[in-house]
Amino acid sequence: MAIYLDFENHIKEIQNEIELALIRGDEDAKEILEKRLEKEVKSIYSNLTDFQKLQLARHPDRPYAMDYIDLILKDKYEVFGDRHYNDDKAIVCFIGKIDNVPVVVIGEEKGRGTKNKLLRNFGMPNPCGYRKALKMAKFAEKFNLPILMLVDTAGAYPGIGAEERGQSEAIAKNLQEFASLKVPTISVIIGEGGSGGALAIAVADKLAMMEYSIFSVISPEGCAAILWDDPSKTEVAIKAMKITPRDLKEAGLIDDIILEPSKGAHRDKFSAANTIKEYFLDALRTIQQDPHFLDNRYQKLMSLGSFVEGMN
């Protein structure tokens, strides 16, 4: 059963009316209602607030990394373990083909259903997850395979055990190593891009965001609690933090925005998956045609956060 957010109530009502018209066999009413639905969807989704976009990024029906991997990766083979400690189920690693192009895919997976969410630790990786990702990145480099990374996490796991096993070191090591990989790297934020937990697999030649995803240094709720001691100021925090694709593209922090189906990726995961596939293939061709892509990646990374002071 489809889950509708509070701002989608009118869409839900029209959808229910369409289903009733189908039961009655009333094709004329169905056609009229479908036109109303299309108009309503366009009206709502063209005027979304940043808070509503955050709700979409966290939508329980939103496609996760495994959904996209199952749809776009063929002849896939999953690889486990970090060769140091354990296998972290919050990070998934695959070898496979996208349109006959051999690739390595690394993704952060939140899981569906209580048991799977617990198995995946709600998509919050431990150090062994980031080390598994690095192991696969080095494998890709050795065999000259491009890398697709799918980012979707509220953040790296903040537990005591994770800190004892070097959470910050694992993330920092990934930032360092991914910056110098000698193969094309493409990262897509598909839902939540939470702080260092996202950055650990977001250093790439091309960094894109799905239209209704977010990328932030802290959750808006956490920001509101720290700055105003009031979690109810989440919407104020969102505006101040500039976490939407549009804001980040304007700031030069991401390269591209991947458009979603009219009602979001959660309403049509097949179209969303195909869009990601086409983006990956187009970006890969662009990178492969550039003999200086490593230098360009370095220059892009070094330019982040730079500024020029005004002259008096």
UniProtKB/Swiss-Prot annotation:
Its EC number is 2.1.3.15. It catalyses: N(6)-carboxybiotinyl-L-lysyl-[protein] + acetyl-CoA = N(6)-biotinyl-L-lysyl-[protein] + malonyl-CoA. GO terms for biological process: fatty acid biosynthetic process; malonyl-CoA biosynthetic process. One of its GO terms (molecular function) is ATP binding. InterPro entries: Acetyl_CoA_COase_a_su, ClpP/crotonase-like_dom_sf, COA_CT_C. PROSITE patterns: COA_CT_CTER. Signal peptide: none annotated. The keyword Repeat does not apply. Pathway: Lipid metabolism; malonyl-CoA biosynthesis; malonyl-CoA from acetyl-CoA: step 1/1. Pfam families: ACCA. Keywords: ATP-binding, Cytoplasm, Fatty acid biosynthesis, Fatty acid metabolism, Lipid biosynthesis, Lipid metabolism, Nucleotide-binding, Transferase. Residues 36-286 form the CoA carboxyltransferase C-terminal domain. It is found in: Cytoplasm. The keyword Nucleotidyltransferase does not apply. GO terms for cellular component: acetyl-CoA carboxylase complex. It comes from the Bacteria. HAMAP family: AcetylCoA_CT_alpha (MF_00823). PANTHER family: ACETYL-COENZYME A CARBOXYLASE CARBOXYL TRANSFERASE SUBUNIT ALPHA (PTHR42853), ACETYL-COENZYME A CARBOXYLASE CARBOXYL TRANSFERASE SUBUNIT ALPHA, CHLOROPLASTIC (PTHR42853:SF3). Belongs to the AccA family. Component of the acetyl coenzyme A carboxylase (ACC) complex. First, biotin carboxylase catalyzes the carboxylation of biotin on its carrier protein (BCCP) and then the CO(2) group is transferred by the carboxyltransferase to acetyl-CoA to form malonyl-CoA. Acetyl-CoA carboxylase is a heterohexamer composed of biotin carboxyl carrier protein (AccB), biotin carboxylase (AccC) and two subunits each of ACCase subunit alpha (AccA) and ACCase subunit beta (AccD). This is Acetyl-coenzyme A carboxylase carboxyl transferase subunit alpha. It comes from Helicobacter pylori (strain P12). The gene is accA.
